[in-house]
Amino acid sequence: LKPVCGCSRLEEVDVRSMKRKALARQMAYMSQGAIPPSGFVVEDLVAFGRMPHQGLLRQWRREDEDAVEKALTQCNLCELRYREIDTLSGGQRQRAWFAMAMAQDTPVLMLDEPTTFLDIGAQIELLEMAVDLNRTQNRTIALVLHDMNLAARYSDWIIAMKAGEIV
């Protein structure tokens, strides 16, 4: 989306002026209801989060492996690492997407309705992981939630919107 006025800045830099790969090293994005390619297993999806750290001269390294392993462990996905994404429950699938964003290893995570289609237990589990990531690794987490009770419980700051306007 292009802003009607103003700009979005990250570390004093307009994000529109940043190259995609540079932005992806600073900010991970988890969209709502994302659909992985058919046949992807959990570990492959999580490893996809390391793409911004790859390049022509920099291929897969030990730190990439460590980031994937850490994300799988923190999201309780180690036992599911070889399962195809489309065989997982909704909560497991959301944890896999969250693990991919974690493996990207950025200072900022943007989560667009990460609790969509999840039962309350899975919602709380995912939000607890986000809070833990914020508190233990000092990562900024910005998320969109429609449940004001969850927003109040898990957020330090809340911006309420109605019809596309901040209220």
Mark where each language-model region is.
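Conserved ABC transporter NBD signature motif
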Residues: 6-14, 23
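Helical segment within the ABC ATPase nucleotide-binding domain
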Residues: 124-137
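Catalytic Walker B motif of ABC-type/P-loop ATPase nucleotide-binding domains
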Residues: 109-113
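Conserved ABC ATPase "signature" region
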Residues: 47, 62-80
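H-loop/switch region of ABC-family ATPase nucleotide-binding domains
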Residues: 145-146
